[in-house]
Structure formats: C-alpha cells, structure tokens
C-alpha cells in the first residue's frame, strides 16, 4: 500500500452517510487506540522508570493482544515510541497552551484533527493524531480527572469517522494495512512531519489568528 500523503478530504453532500466499511474502521479504531495506549505507556514505563507518568487506567485497559487490531495498535506504538519521546516537550507545551478540560477537549481535538488533515491524509498524520490523543488523556488524568481515557477513545473514533480518515483507511484495506509498515527511515520522517504539522497548525490556528 502507498504510504504517502493522500488527497485532501473530498467534497461531498451534507446528507452523505458513512459507508459500512467506514463505520467498521471507526468501530475498530477504539480497539486499535486502546492497544496503542497500553503499549506506548508500557514502553514509557520501561524506558523512563520511576520518571514515567503513572496512569492505572492505561495499565489496566481491556485488551485482546492476539487479535489483529491489538497487533495494529502495538505496531503503531512501536513506530511512534521514538517520535513521542523526541517530541514529548512539544506535546506538553502544546497542551499547556491549550489547557484542555473535560468540557473543551472534544472541540480542541476536532480542531486539531481538522488542521492536521487539512492538506491530506497519511499514516504519519494518523500516528500523530493517535499520539496527541494519548498525550491528551495522560495530561487530563494528571490533573485529577479520572475516567477520561474512555471519552478520548470515543472522541478519536468519531473524528476518524467524520473527517474522512475512516474512508482513507478503508480504501487501503482497513487498519490491518498498518501492519505493512515498520520503523523505517521513510515512515519515521512521515511521523515527524505529522507531529511538526500538528504543532504548527495548532499554534497558528489558536494563537496567531
């Protein structure tokens, strides 16, 4: 499958409903994200030790590790691990500027997704979106709000469905297509590009407009 950036969101009528394959991708997103969160958090604990942020909700997620979707989440976590550590400061600074709460998190998440995918969709940007969802859930939990991870999971599935990302993934065979990728230089560059775009778009949209 091609890993490059795809075309931007197509223009469709307001009454067009997602196809069954798109709805399936959105449904599968929840399991993929839970697996991604669990393994990424596990990796951070292994590499950072006591310095890693604690989150029992992430440690006790219900998983099906041998399922295809569970493997997809783990694969994306492995790909995104180095990038998340490299750009941890940028994520934290972004969240400090946005100050997300339970009341505004969905709106912020939606605007970030709109900015990130404005000029097209790629696996790099999808991984960047998952990474931001992970950081968002961790940030809010550290500020005393428990149970928010489940909301972020639902937010992400909804955004994937209604921003044409589900269509893009479905056209490539579903989430299973992500298993074709490994931690190689080309994909790493794509993920870095996605993270950089995320920061640039959000800062421009919220603080310079």
From Swiss-Prot:
Keywords: Acetylation, Apoptosis, Host-virus interaction, Membrane, Metal-binding, Mitochondrion, Mitochondrion outer membrane, Transmembrane, Transmembrane helix, Zinc. Zn(2+) binds at residues 158, 162. The modification N-acetylalanine is found at residue 2. A motif (BH3) lies at residues 72-86. It is a single-pass membrane protein. The keyword Lyase does not apply. A motif (BH1) lies at residues 115-134. Residues 18-27 have a biased composition (Polar residues). Coiled coil: none annotated. Widely expressed. One of its GO terms (molecular function) is porin activity. GO terms for cellular component: BAK complex; cytosol; endoplasmic reticulum; mitochondrial membrane; mitochondrial outer membrane; mitochondrion; pore complex. It is found in: Mitochondrion outer membrane. The chain crosses the membrane at residues 186-203. In the presence of an appropriate stimulus, accelerates programmed cell death by binding to, and antagonizing the anti-apoptotic action of BCL2. Homodimer. Formation of the homodimer is zinc-dependent. Forms heterodimers with BCL2 and BCL2L1 isoform Bcl-X(L). Forms heterooligomers with BAX. Interacts with BCL2A1. Interacts withRTL10/BOP. Interacts with VDAC1. Interacts with GIMAP3/IAN4 and GIMAP5/IAN5. Belongs to the Bcl-2 family. Intact BH3 motif is required by BIK, BID, BAK, BAD and BAX for their pro-apoptotic activity and for their interaction with anti-apoptotic members of the Bcl-2 family. This is Bcl-2 homologous antagonist/killer. It comes from Mus musculus. The lineage of its organism: Eukaryota, Metazoa, Chordata, Craniata, Vertebrata.
């Amino acid at each position: 499958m091609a890993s490059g950036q795809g075309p931007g969101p197509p223009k469709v009528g307001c009454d067009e409903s997602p196809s069954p394959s798109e709805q399936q991708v959105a449904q599968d997103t929840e399991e993929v994200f839970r697996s991604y969160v669990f393994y990424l958090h596990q990796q951070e604990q292994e590499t950072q030790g006591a310095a890693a942020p604690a989150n029992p909700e992430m440690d006790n997620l219900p998983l099906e590790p041998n399922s295809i979707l569970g493997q997809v989440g783990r694969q994306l976590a492995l790909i995104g691990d180095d990038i998340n550590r490299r750009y941890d400061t940028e994520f934290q600074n972004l969240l400090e500027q946005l100050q997300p709460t339970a009341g505004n998190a969905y709106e912020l998440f939606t605007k970030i997704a709109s900015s990130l995918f404005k000029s097209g969709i790629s696996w790099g940007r999808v991984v960047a979106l998952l990474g931001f969802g992970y950081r968002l859930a961790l940030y809010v939990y550290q500020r005393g709000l428990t149970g928010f991870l489940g909301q972020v999971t639902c937010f992400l599935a909804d955004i994937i469905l209604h921003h044409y990302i589900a269509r893009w993934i479905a056209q490539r065979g579903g989430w299973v297509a992500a298993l074709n990728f490994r931690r190689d230089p080309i994909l790493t560059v794509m993920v870095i590009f996605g993270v950089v775009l995320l920061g640039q778009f959000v800062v421009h949209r919220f603080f310079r407009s």
